[in-house]
Amino acid sequence: MTLVNVGPERFDVWAPDVSSVVLVADGRQYPMQKKETAPGSEGWWTASDAPPNGDVDYGYLLDGNTTPVPEPRSRRLPAGVHNHSRTYNPPPYRWQDSRWRGKELQGTLIYQLHVGTSTPDGTLDAAGEKLSYLVDLGIDFIELLPVNGFNGTHNWGYDGVQWYTVHEGYGGPAAYQRFVDAAHAAGLGVIQDVVYNHLGLRGNYFPKLGPNLKQGDANTLGDSVNLDGAGSDVFREYILDNAALWVGDYHVDGVGFDAVHAVRDERAVHILEDLGALGDAISGETGLPKTLIAESDFNNPRLIYPRDVNGYGLAGQWSDDFHTAVHVSVSGETTGYYSDFESLAVLAKVLKDGFLHDGSYSSFRGRHHGRPINPSLANPAALVVCNQNHDQIGNRATGDRLSQSLSYGQLAVAAVLTLTSPFTPMLFMGEEYGASTPWQFFTSHPEPELGKATAEGRIKEFERMGWDPAVVPDPQDPETFNRSKLDWSEASTGDHARLLELYKSLTALRREHPDLADLGFGQTEVSFDDDAGWLRFRPVSVEVLVNLSDAKVRLDDAAGDLLLATDEGNPLDGGSLALVPWSAAVLKS
């Protein structure tokens, strides 16, 4: 695999579907010739007379076209995804993280962060100013939402079209290097979200070059990328090299794979298995753990099983069932995909087994779904869980957070359930202080017709789900983006500050009781009363008692020292604990 294209071959491009390619670099044209390559990788072009080393703006003229297209492996696109690439090889940065030893996933806490809305400036340098805050909060990994090149000036990042570049609005690759280096100096790992299931609609020049997409084979997000058809060897290498770019050249500690349930690959060796092997190989070479995590709604534990038992060997995968069970328990919402999660028996099952649907019938899907996790092949820490994330907030009609409709007590209960679970917790930025700002779906397509179609499609999508179309914000309106930016001043006021202190106490509790993340599936003891609205579970050294109702409850046999209470009105009297409505307590068992 080619991590960095350097020397005379740095401008090579794969374009098997064209008959002529001309490299345009700093205004000069360099005719390219086809290279002789091994079977499966035919279609590479090279320029025998190429520009000298140094910063060069360049692109490619295909089949006599007078408008150049950028390189698919562009490290920099200073003028956006429709314009010339700029060389960035080798990366001119002196890393200072030689003493960084990395982190394994087990026992850690992840913080999801979108660069553009995390601060008023929306840059990596500005986000870097929050590192000490995250250390104080007790975070281990910062998971950055995609930073790759996309159409327009602001976007979630999941419709990227230039996977090798860092969006210039965030500061470009130099700012990215500074951010990762500073994170490591602060003791924080970095996980980079990537999207390998589709490409965005505009700025995507792959179809002009070769069979990179499976035309007519769309997933729910767009045309599927070509991972198993004719000519797919090179695109698979493109993906593997991209993952190696982040964990190698950019020193990140892990990669988060977006929506792997939308990755279409019918080869005998799935691309995720190849990625798992790549991560292990780089870990072996560097001596640093490289954490690969899959977002998946398949409830298929094969993702985290070892490769020697036909698994993919990833370090972790999401359990959306945990989010849904907690959401229903604290909010009472039971429509749509929340419909199977109404009983506390569901939350109890998820706490013990990781999934609700592990082969059971899903009424939302209209079919049976998932499979059980074999406890001899995976442990609960391999499941990444949350009570909110970018999808679960942003894909609601108004992008509303739990904090915009729930009380302090309900938010506190959700926090306790998440941060004392046997899984790996993930927070979404601002959750820890109950941010009142929404996180809405926003785009900035410069093409009016695409912007209009995006807005209309969003409204129709929520109309079908029963939402009032009048409440759905226009993703193209700049105010939709601006509304989604965090207001950090909230964190020091009222219940926001109170909730933040609770989160800090909970992260400290996890550090003081590492056995919370050292259980096997089925080992968490859980009891509950649906009618009374309480649930209690015992992850080894502590017992967690939760009141999920509007009435006060008294729980007997509550032995042990009180380690944490979300409300001062939760007195422990001998072996009895009184829980006020919507509160929780943690005892040393």
Curated annotation (Swiss-Prot):
Cross-referenced SUPFAM superfamilies, in alphabetical order? (Trans)glycosidases, E set domains
Q: Which SMART domains match?
A: Aamy
* GO MF entries: 4-alpha-D-(1->4)-alpha-D-glucanotrehalose trehalohydrolase activity
Listed A to Z, the keywords are: Carbohydrate metabolism, Cytoplasm, Glycosidase, Hydrolase
Q: Which Pfam families match?
A: Alpha-amylase, DUF3459
List the EC numbers from the record.
3.2.1.141
Task: Tell me where it resides.
Answer: Cytoplasm
The biological processes this protein is annotated with in GO are: trehalose biosynthetic process
Which residues are annotated as site, described as Transition state stabilizer? D391
Query: Which pathway is this protein engaged in?
Result: Glycan biosynthesis; trehalose biosynthesis
What is the protein's major site of localization? cytoplasm
Q: From the UniProt record, list the reaction(s) this protein catalyses.
A: hydrolysis of (1->4)-alpha-D-glucosidic linkage in 4-alpha-D-[(1->4)-alpha-D-glucanosyl]n trehalose to yield trehalose and (1->4)-alpha-D-glucan
Listed transmembrane segments: none
Per the record, GO CC terms? cytoplasm
Kindly give the InterPro entries that the UniProt entry links to this protein.
Answer: DUF3459 (IPR022567), Glyco_hydro_13_cat_dom (IPR006047), Glycoside_hydrolase_SF (IPR017853), Ig-like_fold (IPR013783), Ig_E-set (IPR014756), Trehalose_TreZ (IPR012768), Trehalose_TreZ_E-set_sf (IPR044901)
Residue numbers binding substrate: 256-261, 320-324, 390-395
- Active site at which residues? D258, E295
Q: Which family does it belong to?
A: Belongs to the glycosyl hydrolase 13 family.
Q: List, alphabetically, the PANTHER family matched.
A: GLYCOGEN DEBRANCHING ENZYME
Protein name in UniProt: Malto-oligosyltrehalose trehalohydrolase
Identify the species of origin.
Answer: Brevibacterium helvolum
